[in-house]
Structure formats: C-alpha cells, structure tokens
Amino acid sequence: MMLNLVVADGPRQLSAREKAAKLKKSGLSFAQRKALREEEKKNAWKKEQGGITTTIEDRMKRREQDNPPVRPKPYDKPYEKKPYEKKPFEKKPYEKKSYDKPVASKPVEETDEEKYQRLMEGGKRPEKERWVPQRNFRNRRDMEKAGKDQSQDATPKHHDRDVIGTREDGSLIRRIREKTGAKGGIKGTYVSSIFSEKKEDRIAGEDVQMEDEEEEEAENNAESSNAALKDSTTFSGLGCSQRLVDALVGMQLAKPTKIQRATIPRLIQRERDLFVQAQTGSGKTLAFVLPVLERIMSCDDVSRETGLFAVILTPTRELTTQIYSVLETLCRKACPWIVPGIVIGGEKKKSEKARIRKGVNILVATPGRLADHFDNTEALDLSQVRWVVLDEGDRLMELGFEETITKILRTIEWKSVLRGENYLKDIPKNLKPLPSRRVTVLCSATMKGGVTELGKSTLKDADWVSNDSVEDALAETSVETFSAPSQLVQEWVVVPAKLRLVTLLGALRGDILQSSEKTNTKVIVFLSCSDSVDFHFDVLSRDGSQINKMDTAKTAPLLLDDVSTSVYKLHGSLSQQARTATLASFAKNSTPSILLCTDVASRGLDLPKITHVIEYDPPFSIEDHLHRVGRTARAGQDGRALLFLLPGAEEGYVEKLKQSQQMKKTTYENILAAGFGGKGWDFAATNYHLDVERWVLGDETALDRARRGFTSHIRAYATHIAAEKDMFNVRMLHLGHLAKSFALREAPGKLGKKKDPEKIKVNKDGSLDETQARKKMLDRSRKHVYNSGESAMGGYVLE
C-alpha cells in the first residue's frame, strides 16, 4: 500500500515523517502500520535490484550465469556401462570356525599289534573328525543351543569302548598275550587261558568297569561344582567381583591371606553367624568388609537413601577411623553409590547427625557413641540392618562394653524389618540378594572367658574360623597358645637402669642405619605412661621443627646427621583430633619415622610398613606383649621386635614368653656399638647422656617433664598383675639409677615439687604407699607451726 500526497504541481513522494503522520491518522493498528512499512522497504529493494524474475526460465538463466558449468578435462573418460556377465557358481571348501563342533567321527584302521600297544599305554582310539558349518544365528544363545542339539543328535548310538576289559578288546589282548611273549606258545601255538570265558563273568566284569567310570565321573563333577573356590589364591576365586578385585589391586592387595580365604566365601554364600579367631595382622578387616560390599553391590538401585545395611563396632576411636578409611577407599574405587559413615566419641555430634540424616549404608562406630545416637537421633533407620560386626571382641569386653553391646543388638533386632511371620513381604525386591536374617560376626585375637560369654550371648548357630586347624583351635582357650607371626624376629636385651636412655637411642639409630630401605623405616616405641612419652619425645625432638603445625610431630636433627628423621607421640591424654592427625601423618610420612606411644596404639591399628617395634617398658601382661609386637610383621611382611629388661628378676619374664614363641638374646654393648659408631661407642654414649642432662638442668620445662616422667613410670611399674609381681617388684628397683635414665641428677627423695617433695614409699607386696609420705609431710607442717608459735611467744606455747 503506497501513500501519496497530491498537490497543485502534481504528485510527489512523501518524506518519512509525513508517511509516519499519515499512517498514524489512518486509524490502523501498530502491527498493521509496521507491516506496511516492511512491505514498502521490500518493494524499494526489489526496485533497486532491477525487478523480480517471475518465470522459471529467467531463474534458470540467472542460475547458469551465477554457476557456469565445469568444462570436461581431456583426461576425463565417459562412463561406459558394461553388460552383466553371469559367472558360474564355485563351491569353496568350508573353513572350520571356533564355534563348530564335531558331529561324527571315523575310526582309523589299525592292526592288532598297534591296538594292543595303544591299549597297554592307555591311549585313546585315533579318529578323523568331520565338521559341518553352523548356520547364521541371531545371538550367542541360539548358536550355543543349536550346537548342543546338534552334538546330541550326532552322538553315535553304538560305539566301541576303548577300555581294557571289554568284550572285543579283552579277547584281543588275551589272544596276543597267549600268542607272543613269555606266556606265548611255541611256534605260534596258543596257551589256554586260566580265566573263565563264561558270558556271566564277562558281563560282571563289564559292570565293574562301568561302576568305576561312574565313580570317576562323579568325582570330576564334584570338583567342578565349586570351581569358584578352586583358585583360592586370588580374591576373584573367593567370589569377589571384578570391580572389587581391581580396587584391591590399586591398594596393592593382590592375594588374600589365610583367614580371608576361610572367611570371605562363608559370608558371601551363607547366612550364618561367624566367630573369627586369628592372630594380629592377619587381615581380619578385609575378611568381613569385602563380603558385605559384595552382597550390597549385587542389589539394584542402591543409594544412600536405601537404608543402613551393616553396623561395625570397634573398641577404640583409632581402630574405628582405620576401618572407615579402608571402607571409604574401597567404596570410592569400586562402588561409589555405597556410602560409609563413622560416629566416634570426641567428634561433634551435630555433624554426625547431619551425615546420618543424609543417609549411610555402612556405619562404623564405637559402642558408646552409637548407643547415644540410638537414643537421641531419630533419623537413624535400623530397619534394613543385615550385618553386625564386633571387631576386637576381647578388647570390647576389657573396656566394659558388654552391656552396651547387648543394648545395641536388642535395639537393632526390635527395629528390624526381618521380624514377624510375613517379613519377606516387607523387603523390597531390589534387596532380595541381601541375607534374609541378621548375620553377626565376632572377631577376636584371643579366646578368653569374656569373649566366650560374648559369643554365647550374641551368636546363634555360628560357624568358627581360625588360622589353625579346628582340632588345634578348640584347645585355644588361653593366651599361652596364642602365637605371634612366624616371620617376626624377636630379641630381648638386659640393660642396666642408668643406661636405658642411651641404649634406646642406640637402638633407634641402629634400626634406621641398618635397615635395607632407610626411607621406609618406621619404628614404634612402647612406653608405660603418657608422662614418659612426653619426656622422651622432647629429648629426641629438641631443636627440631614442627611437622604440619602439629605439637605431636617434630623432626629429630640430633638423632642422625645424614638422615632426616621424624618423631611422633601418641597417648590417651591427647585430644581426638590430635590423635587422628598424628596417626595419619605417621602413616603417610615417607622419611624414617619414630612413634612414641602407650598401649593405646597396640590394639587393632594397621599402621603400614612398621619395620621395628621396641618395648622400652615391659608390657603389663603377655597378651599386651603379643599385641605390641603384632604391629609389625603384618600381612606376610618381615619385622623385628626388641624387649628391654632390667637385670635380675625381670630376666625370668623371658621364660614365660618363650612358651609360645621364639626369642633370642642380644647385648646392650652390641646395640650401643651399632648406634654410636663402633670403636669409642662408650665415650660417644656418655657425651650424649651428659648433653641431655645439661639440657634438662637448663630448661625448667624439660626438668618438670623429667620429674613427672620418672614418678609416673614408678606408679605404672607398680600396676603389673599379681602373677608377675615376683618379676616386676617396685621394691627391687634402684631408684637412683632409674632417675639417671630420665637425665635427673637429683636424689629420688628430692624429686618432689619445690622444697616439700612427696617421697615414694613401697609396701611389702610391691604397691605404692602414699599414706606414710603424707603423714610425714603433715608432721613437718605441724612442726613448722609449733616453731613459729614458740618464737612468737618467747619460747612458750599457749595451750
């Protein structure tokens, strides 16, 4: 639509402003006016282009002008269509495929002598196999089915049995034996056989042969029925999926241990309670973790919201953290949809509740904190719990968790979906691969009375697995029959009290210098009390720098000049955060590392690559000794352990230890010579001890640590069990020489605080008697009051 304005001089083209005003007054809508403007612009553009081609011929001409045809090249040849020639069909010989099966056999002709020789050697009858091609199948199932049917149809109904004793072969053998050899006749004559030729006897012989073949076939079938367990040297042979096997290979765990080979198939294939008794370092953690993960991985649509399937209870926070670390690594590498969780004392309960609220599938916990969550955390759903694992059962009983564990098991049983007659209807279909009943696993290194009672109250119709045979294991009801790993080398040394400190330093330096791989040397030193740990940590790490800003980890520049060494300390008085960080740093450190600790690190912890264990203070029982030395020589690796003893009655302690293990004696002279450089080791050791004494005298904090370490060591020494009081009697100690081992130059009676020390007195039975010291101090204070009053009143005291 064109809008033109007519004037006196004739029509003229309107300007843009005039056109806009005209359109606005026309009464058209905004959309209509916009369409008119667009149409006008389009017509103007077409006019500038010289018009619009309206016919097909014009368009074709313009296309040819824009795209001229390509001129043929001189080397281009026109395409010539050849007539079809029918070729005669040529039948090619069939090539045997891998899936083809023989359908018929043609026996090879042989003479009587050849057949006799073959039967005597036990060979099979040679045959020529004929193969037929298989048709094209849609899938592998049809191919296998067709091959099976074809092979069954092609089996000959009547065939000769190639076994000595049949009708044809037996007669042939008899004829050849009678005709030739030592039993043959003269000049080709026959010697009559003494065996019967009756038909009944011959049939009976054939029946016996058939029975032998049936028994052999049954034995072969019995071996193949458990083919999954035939290769028990690998995790896949035990029933673990390939995802778990790959994750274990990534963790440098390629072969299972003996206890794992006995435990994993039982927990995967059966639904019975299990008691696992094995020595320390045998791999009990993976023995119950892998079956739980394998069964959960077999379920479909499992996520953190599906529910809690397994609860693992441990006695200590460190062991709980260790098991959780193993679980978290396996789940991250093999099954990231399975979520583990951890609840322990010392952590924020609010954070634990948040993790439980999000959902966990496997929960590792200490009994006390878990019982607290049972009472106060409503989001903790226990309806789908299928496994309850009690690790370190003997330690759980020692710490008094029996009542708490009973409460936990009752709560789980009460809230479980597996209760009632119609419980199977309440189980989701995707959880059918899980056990249909709750499975309880009790793991322990020893069989003490408390563990036996715990097993009776928690296990029902349980199997029992041990490293030893069942007959030997049934007799293991005491710690005397409990042995340390065979690859562990144990030594003991008698050291005078005043040489204990320098001998410890010599042993540490010798272990690091003589180790085949100095960078991987890790030593654990066990002491009797936390104050002693703090003192020796300060001695070894003085002038050292902190590691990762931790107060429990420092470098030890004075220990060795040419080797960078790190020193850590660990005891129960530290906070949970400090203990966890210390263990993690000690485990990951690639330089030579020394961990000074109490018995808090002697149970359950699987610290990697511990090469040496030093028992600087004797253990409080033989069981504690076995758990201490069990920190090394784990999972088949080599390890060494050294026990320090004082001269005299303590030497009899070795006879008790030798009842269950082998120990050899060494001398402190050899240890000092190896640690302080051969010749002149006595002067070097003396100079080092004097240097420590000067440092203690010059530092008030170090002096206080030394005093506290000495007094705490005496108190701890008096806590040995009554059966060992004859060997560890406090009254037999030389307190002056023992104070020397703590770099103290004061007499034992002056080791109290400031001017009024508390003297250490011992009863006849070896226990500490503090009442006498308190009485003397009270008398001294009264005497002081009396003297002060007498001087004030001129020598007289008022009544």
From Swiss-Prot:
Domain of life according to the entry: Eukaryota
GO MF annotation terms: ATP binding; ATP hydrolysis activity; RNA binding; RNA helicase activity
Motif Q motif per UniProt: ranges: 233-261
InterPro entries for this protein: DEAD/DEAH_box_helicase_dom, Helicase_ATP-bd, Helicase_C-like, P-loop_NTPase, SPB4-like_CTE
Motif (DEAD box): 391-394
Domain remarks: The Q motif is unique to and characteristic of the DEAD box family of RNA helicases and controls ATP binding and hydrolysis.
Ranges for domain Helicase C-terminal: 511-679
Gene Ontology CC: nucleolus; nucleus
Stretches with biased composition (Acidic residues): 208-220
Pfam family, one: DEAD
Localisation: Nucleus, Nucleolus
Broad EC category: hydrolase
GO biological process: ribosome biogenesis; rRNA processing
PROSITE patterns to which the protein is assigned, alphabetical: HELICASE_ATP_BIND_1, HELICASE_CTER, Q_MOTIF
Higher taxonomy: Eukaryota, Fungi, Dikarya, Ascomycota, Saccharomycotina
Gene3D superfamilies associated with the record: P-loop containing nucleotide triphosphate hydrolases
Protein name: ATP-dependent RNA helicase DBP7
Keyword list, A-Z: ATP-binding, Helicase, Hydrolase, Nucleotide-binding, Nucleus, Ribosome biogenesis, RNA-binding, rRNA processing
Binding site for ATP: 278-285, 306-313
Annotated family: Belongs to the DEAD box helicase family. DDX31/DBP7 subfamily.
Chief location bin: nucleus
Protein function: ATP-binding RNA helicase involved in the biogenesis of 60S ribosomal subunits and is required for the normal formation of 25S and 5.8S rRNAs.
